[in-house]
Design a protein with these regions (language model features):
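Charged, compositionally biased interaction regions
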Residues: 1-214
């Protein structure tokens, strides 16, 4: 079978797969054949993947209550990278969440990279996530690597078919025994200042006038 264009954005190499033999089929007049077009996201499977994640979130929170939100970026095939925000309360909690996520559902075992952040981070904003990774993660302490784990057979980046590594990034604030240093204080405007700026925004930054309307 193959080559076949897949949701990864690559053609799968021809290979041997089980044979399906159809003896007969009945169809009505003017029948509609329903299918999806796969390829590099955004595509139809990525939209379905985002909807399915919303279905699975209650199950995630039931098993891992500290999870506030989870996102599977469509750019990462909708399952190979996960960004998870948690309400952190104790040291080592991010690693517990990583292991729990990989173990919860068979599909989640195919996720290669899990990034865990605090609940003040917008997990759907890459600038926010990258800021957390850059300021709350130390590579010598906050990476958890696992090898020879189940992986997507379509992932030709893995050294062996069906077996590959996983990486967890703890991009949360470090508390308790996770650090011996005083944690930095973040720069934030007060709610009152934000309100005043919002009220006077157009005064500070007037919109250019459209001369064509004169």
């Amino acid at each position: 079978e193959g080559p076949f264009g897949d949701h990864t954005g690559y053609y799968n190499a021809p290979d041997t797969y089980p044979v399906f033999r159809l003896k007969r089929i009945r169809v009505r007049d003017n029948a509609h054949y329903l299918t999806t077009f796969t390829g590099r996201a955004p595509d139809e499977p990525s939209v379905l993947g985002e909807a399915l994640l919303e279905v699975f979130k209650p199950l995630l929170r039931q098993q891992i209550p500290e999870i506030v939100d989870a996102w599977l970026p469509p750019e990462a095939c909708s399952y190979r990278i996960a960004v998870i925000s948690i309400a952190k309360k104790y040291a080592g909690q991010a690693r517990r969440v990583m292991m729990g996520f990989w173990s919860l559902l068979p599909q989640f075992s195919m996720t290669k990279l899990v990034i865990v952040v605090d609940d003040d981070i917008d997990i759907r904003s890459w600038p926010d996530v990258m800021w957390a990774v850059a300021t709350r993660m130390d590579p010598s302490r906050d990476l958890m690597q696992v090898d020879r784990t189940p992986i997507d057979q379509l992932d030709f980046a893995s050294p062996q078919e069906g077996l590959g590594g996983k990486l967890g990034l703890d991009a949360t604030r470090k508390i308790g025994s996770e650090t011996s240093r005083e944690w930095g204080k973040e720069l934030r405007m007060s709610a009152d200042i934000e309100r005043k700026i919002s009220l006077r925004w157009n005064e500070f930054f007037p919109q250019p006038t459209d001369r064509s309307q004169r």
